[in-house]
Amino acid sequence: MDEVVSTASYASTVGSMTFRKTDHHKNAIDYEVAGLMWLAAARPDGAGIVEVLDHGKGWLTEPELSTGHPTREAAEDFGRRLAHTHAAGASHLGAAPDGFVPDDGYIGRAPLPLPSEPISSWGEFYAQYRIEPYMDSLDADARAIMSKLVDLLASGALDHDEPALVTCPAARTHGDMWAGNLMWTPDGVVLIDPAAQGGHAEEDLAALSVFGAPFAERIRAAYNEESPLADGWEDRIGLHQLHMLIVHCWLFGGGYVDQTVAIARRWV
């Protein structure tokens, strides 16, 4: 895969600063813009989403966000709001955001399959579209473990319900909710850089801990109060982290492989 060419610059506009992002990889900006607008449509009850001020072929402009300090109160407010973003729903697992013609999206620099047709179960979807596409980066021993997990997922044995407020076939997810994509502003958490899609809500919640988002436990606790999670959700955090981790295996290799395989072993 060719490396994504992505740059950023800042400009002052009437006392405020804007952030211009360019990315010349096929459809990357179109996907990001559609995702930001789709997630923002869950407002006013949903999570804060950075505004798209303008965009064109291969570029978008956003406001530069003022940074604040993470607090328990902001984390809990974000958890409750995220529950409502998820509840806005999607037509099916892997659904592209409205306004984006189904094609591969991106999670970071990695391609992200966005199937246009519904898949029969979460486990089948997760195995076929969120684990298998990245397994070619693993050595034979790691692939053997992951293949066992893929088979178990595809069987439906690990399927579980969405949170209580999600009544659509899939949640409206950010899709790349690692710590760096949560901006702690004076007005609360604002999300940036999505890989927006129809997904399982627990994946966003699990991703918070992959790189240690501040107050991740308080975010999940407040979410669970607002939209109760299915029994056993805490045990599934690792399972829902596997997509993000195997993407990092595909991109970077190294210690991510050991971490990914260790989680998979717990299930097989």
Show the residue positions of the predicted features.
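ATP-binding glycine-rich phosphate-binding loop
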Residues: 1-15
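ATP-binding pocket architecture of kinase catalytic cores
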Residues: 12-121
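Short, solvent-exposed loop/turn segments at secondary-structure junctions
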Residues: 25-26, 55-59, 66-68, 131, ...
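Short strand-connecting beta-turns/loops that link adjacent beta-strands
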Residues: 57, 186-188, 242
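An alpha-helical support segment within catalytic cores of ATP-dependent transferases
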Residues: 90-172
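Active-site Asp-x-Gly
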Residues: 115-127, 166-172, 179-235, 254
